Amino acid sequence: MEENKQKALSAALSQIERQFGKGSVMRMGDSTVSRDIEAISTGSLGLDIALGIGGLPKGRIVEIYGPESSGKTTLTLQVIAECQKMGGTAAFIDAEHALDPSYAQKLGVKVDELLVSQPDTGEQALEITDMLVRSAAVDVVIIDSVAALTPKAEIEGEMGDSHVGLQARLMSQALRKLTANIKRSNTLVIFINQIRMKIGVMFGSPETTTGGNALKFYASVRLDIRRIGSIKKGEEILGSETRVKVVKNKVAPPFKMTEFDILYNEGISRESEIINLGVQLNLIEKSGAWYSYKQEKIGQGKENVRLYLKENPQVAAELEQQIRTELLEKKLSVLASSSEDLFETIDD
């Protein structure tokens, strides 16, 4: 009986391959199936670690949402900068018509190489996104934002006209079409979203994101970004303290949280993260206000240590590598070995 089943399965597989092409269906244990997910760094060491794979996954949809001025666009511009450092191509679909090239340049984005589109309608924005994805030549596409993807019927209609559920239908239709193309081209597509309040909610959070429920389902990673405080030097505000929660993660364990500093005109402070994580892992010793590395004092107060690491990039790079090895690479090797065991079990 088992032999007959095996023959029937082989016949079905060969028929599928003849009809739909080679690779239409395959065993997960086949070496041709990629088990490793490529990632693009977020520019934040803590967030890369919280995401579990060292960044945002390629070939997937990511949603970043939060209140106004919480750092959503800054985070995506940092992702573009990291992508360009790796020699990749990035596109920014500016539906809000609010992209500031000089600010992007300060964050390390090569603005001359960045593809930018300012579409007139939501349909146009999503069609451009689909065409860029299908080209398989773009590594990252950012859509800023879902709330600004206004359907054509709404733009061409009168001010007071009712268009119930039009944007949600548009998003649902577009994502059905986009998902397969994104996987095939291995492009990272990031949707920035805004928060709205649901009326009449008695229990639970009244917060919701715009554009219906489709994006919640199709996104492999959802990040909730919030501003939790200000960074001050006397009376002057230098930046904001930011918290990011990984609300959904299909590629690693979810619900991890991280905090980092966003400095105005500079972006995410890599040095501040190195200090915080270095102290946590005892790579940097903290005694009172003094910080030491390899028995040598490197500064009094966090701000002085940050300046020291900025002036000594080789020390910062050395510390970052130690932190990545300790918190990320060890976890990834454990995950890889456990997945190898799983695939071996499937093959058996």
UniProtKB/Swiss-Prot annotation:
Transmembrane segments: none annotated. The keyword Nucleotidyltransferase does not apply. ATP binds at G66, P67, E68, S69, S70, G71, K72, T73. CDD domains: RecA. Gene3D superfamilies: P-loop containing nucleotide triphosphate hydrolases. GO terms for cellular component: cytosol. It holds the Pfam family RecA. InterPro entries: AAA+_ATPase (IPR003593), DNA_recomb/repair_RecA (IPR013765), DNA_recomb/repair_RecA_CS (IPR020584), P-loop_NTPase (IPR027417), RecA-like_C (IPR049261), RecA-like_N (IPR049428), RecA_ATP-bd (IPR020588), RecA_C_sf (IPR023400). GO terms for molecular function: ATP binding; ATP hydrolysis activity; ATP-dependent DNA damage sensor activity; damaged DNA binding; single-stranded DNA binding. Disulfide bonds: none annotated. This is Protein RecA. It comes from Legionella pneumophila subsp. pneumophila (strain Philadelphia 1 / ATCC 33152 / DSM 7513).
